[in-house]
Amino acid sequence: MKRCIFILYFLALAVSIASDAKRPNIVLIMADDLGFADLGCYGSEIQTPNLDTLAAEGLRFSQFYNTAKCHSSRVSLLTGLYCDQAGGAKLDRGATIAEVLGQADYFTAMVGKWHLSKEPTDFGFQRYWGHLSGATSFFKGDNTFRFNGEKYEVPETLNGRPF
Protein backbone atom coordinates (compact mmCIF):
# COMPACT_ATOMS: atom_id res chain seq x y z
CA MET A 1 0.00 0.00 0.00
CA LYS A 2 2.81 2.40 0.87
CA ARG A 3 4.41 1.67 -2.49
CA CYS A 4 1.13 2.51 -4.29
CA ILE A 5 0.78 5.82 -2.42
CA PHE A 6 4.44 6.62 -3.12
CA ILE A 7 3.98 5.95 -6.86
CA LEU A 8 0.76 7.99 -6.99
CA TYR A 9 2.48 10.88 -5.21
CA PHE A 10 5.33 11.00 -7.71
CA LEU A 11 2.94 10.56 -10.61
CA ALA A 12 0.92 13.55 -9.40
CA LEU A 13 4.14 15.52 -8.89
CA ALA A 14 5.31 14.68 -12.42
CA VAL A 15 1.98 15.78 -13.91
CA SER A 16 2.12 19.01 -11.91
CA ILE A 17 5.67 19.78 -13.06
CA ALA A 18 4.82 18.91 -16.66
CA SER A 19 1.80 21.22 -16.66
CA ASP A 20 3.95 24.12 -15.44
CA ALA A 21 6.60 23.59 -18.11
CA LYS A 22 6.55 25.92 -21.10
CA ARG A 23 5.07 24.15 -24.10
CA PRO A 24 7.21 24.13 -27.22
CA ASN A 25 6.21 25.81 -30.44
CA ILE A 26 5.81 23.25 -33.21
CA VAL A 27 6.64 24.07 -36.82
CA LEU A 28 6.35 21.07 -39.11
CA ILE A 29 7.65 21.56 -42.64
CA MET A 30 6.94 19.15 -45.47
CA ALA A 31 8.12 20.08 -48.94
CA ASP A 32 7.21 18.21 -52.11
CA ASP A 33 10.09 17.29 -54.40
CA LEU A 34 12.74 18.07 -51.80
CA GLY A 35 15.38 15.39 -51.67
CA PHE A 36 17.17 14.15 -48.56
CA ALA A 37 20.45 15.74 -49.66
CA ASP A 38 18.96 19.12 -50.62
CA LEU A 39 19.39 20.74 -47.18
CA GLY A 40 22.62 21.73 -45.48
CA CYS A 41 21.59 20.08 -42.20
CA TYR A 42 21.62 16.72 -44.01
CA GLY A 43 25.03 17.28 -45.59
CA SER A 44 24.21 19.17 -48.79
CA GLU A 45 26.64 21.69 -50.22
CA ILE A 46 23.60 23.88 -50.91
CA GLN A 47 23.40 26.62 -48.28
CA THR A 48 20.11 26.60 -46.39
CA PRO A 49 20.99 28.61 -43.26
CA ASN A 50 17.48 29.34 -42.00
CA LEU A 51 16.31 25.75 -42.30
CA ASP A 52 19.63 24.57 -40.85
CA THR A 53 19.06 26.80 -37.80
CA LEU A 54 15.56 25.39 -37.31
CA ALA A 55 16.98 21.87 -37.59
CA ALA A 56 19.82 22.59 -35.15
CA GLU A 57 17.51 24.09 -32.52
CA GLY A 58 14.68 21.62 -32.89
CA LEU A 59 13.84 18.08 -33.85
CA ARG A 60 14.53 16.68 -37.28
CA PHE A 61 13.66 13.38 -38.88
CA SER A 62 16.64 11.14 -39.52
CA GLN A 63 14.80 7.95 -40.43
CA PHE A 64 11.78 8.33 -42.61
CA TYR A 65 10.16 6.92 -45.71
CA ASN A 66 8.59 8.87 -48.53
CA THR A 67 6.20 7.23 -50.95
CA ALA A 68 6.04 7.93 -54.66
CA LYS A 69 2.71 9.72 -54.19
CA CYS A 70 2.69 12.95 -52.24
CA HIS A 71 -0.70 12.41 -50.57
CA SER A 72 0.45 9.15 -48.97
CA SER A 73 3.39 10.84 -47.26
CA ARG A 74 1.19 13.74 -46.18
CA VAL A 75 -1.44 11.40 -44.70
CA SER A 76 1.24 9.47 -42.78
CA LEU A 77 2.83 12.65 -41.45
CA LEU A 78 -0.54 14.04 -40.36
CA THR A 79 -1.78 10.87 -38.66
CA GLY A 80 1.24 8.76 -37.75
CA LEU A 81 -0.39 5.87 -39.62
CA TYR A 82 0.27 4.20 -42.93
CA CYS A 83 -1.83 5.87 -45.60
CA ASP A 84 -4.17 2.89 -45.96
CA GLN A 85 -4.68 2.66 -42.19
CA ALA A 86 -5.80 6.31 -42.10
CA GLY A 87 -8.28 5.83 -44.93
CA GLY A 88 -6.11 7.19 -47.73
CA ALA A 89 -6.80 10.70 -48.97
CA LYS A 90 -10.19 10.60 -47.20
CA LEU A 91 -8.49 10.65 -43.77
CA ASP A 92 -11.56 8.92 -42.35
CA ARG A 93 -9.75 6.79 -39.75
CA GLY A 94 -7.55 8.03 -36.93
CA ALA A 95 -6.86 11.56 -35.76
CA THR A 96 -4.60 14.16 -37.33
CA ILE A 97 -1.81 15.89 -35.46
CA ALA A 98 -3.82 19.12 -35.77
CA GLU A 99 -6.80 17.54 -34.01
CA VAL A 100 -4.63 16.22 -31.19
CA LEU A 101 -2.76 19.51 -30.76
CA GLY A 102 -6.04 21.44 -30.85
CA GLN A 103 -7.33 19.36 -27.92
CA ALA A 104 -4.17 20.39 -26.04
CA ASP A 105 -5.02 24.08 -26.66
CA TYR A 106 -2.45 24.61 -29.40
CA PHE A 107 -3.29 26.98 -32.25
CA THR A 108 -3.01 25.05 -35.52
CA ALA A 109 -2.51 26.40 -39.03
CA MET A 110 -1.55 24.96 -42.38
CA VAL A 111 -0.14 26.76 -45.39
CA GLY A 112 0.34 25.25 -48.83
CA LYS A 113 -0.90 22.33 -50.88
CA TRP A 114 -3.57 20.13 -49.32
CA HIS A 115 -4.45 17.56 -52.04
CA LEU A 116 -6.58 15.45 -49.67
CA SER A 117 -10.33 15.21 -49.14
CA LYS A 118 -12.41 18.13 -47.89
CA GLU A 119 -10.40 21.03 -46.44
CA PRO A 120 -7.72 21.28 -43.72
CA THR A 121 -10.17 23.07 -41.42
CA ASP A 122 -12.25 19.86 -41.44
CA PHE A 123 -9.30 17.98 -39.92
CA GLY A 124 -8.31 20.15 -36.97
CA PHE A 125 -6.50 23.07 -38.57
CA GLN A 126 -7.92 26.34 -37.29
CA ARG A 127 -6.47 28.41 -40.14
CA TYR A 128 -5.58 27.51 -43.71
CA TRP A 129 -4.24 29.31 -46.75
CA GLY A 130 -3.31 27.40 -49.85
CA HIS A 131 -4.70 25.35 -52.68
CA LEU A 132 -6.71 22.17 -52.47
CA SER A 133 -5.53 20.71 -55.78
CA GLY A 134 -2.44 18.60 -56.36
CA ALA A 135 -0.67 21.22 -58.45
CA THR A 136 -1.36 24.76 -59.55
CA SER A 137 0.29 27.92 -60.78
CA PHE A 138 1.22 30.19 -57.90
CA PHE A 139 1.30 33.04 -60.42
CA LYS A 140 -2.21 32.59 -61.81
CA GLY A 141 -3.77 30.31 -59.23
CA ASP A 142 -6.82 28.19 -59.83
CA ASN A 143 -10.27 27.87 -58.33
CA THR A 144 -9.04 25.78 -55.39
CA PHE A 145 -7.17 28.49 -53.46
CA ARG A 146 -8.72 28.95 -50.02
CA PHE A 147 -8.25 31.20 -47.03
CA ASN A 148 -9.95 29.70 -43.98
CA GLY A 149 -12.49 27.86 -46.13
CA GLU A 150 -13.38 30.81 -48.34
CA LYS A 151 -12.43 30.94 -52.02
CA TYR A 152 -9.37 33.15 -52.50
CA GLU A 153 -8.67 34.96 -55.77
CA VAL A 154 -4.95 35.17 -56.46
CA PRO A 155 -4.23 38.80 -57.46
CA GLU A 156 -2.69 39.42 -60.86
CA THR A 157 -0.50 42.19 -59.49
CA LEU A 158 0.93 43.25 -56.18
CA ASN A 159 1.82 46.92 -55.80
CA GLY A 160 1.49 47.35 -59.55
CA ARG A 161 3.97 44.58 -60.33
CA PRO A 162 3.22 41.06 -61.59
CA PHE A 163 2.51 38.76 -58.70
PLM-predicted stretches and their roles:
Residues 2, 18-163:
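Formylglycine-dependent sulfatase
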Residues 4-14:
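Sec-dependent N-terminal signal peptides
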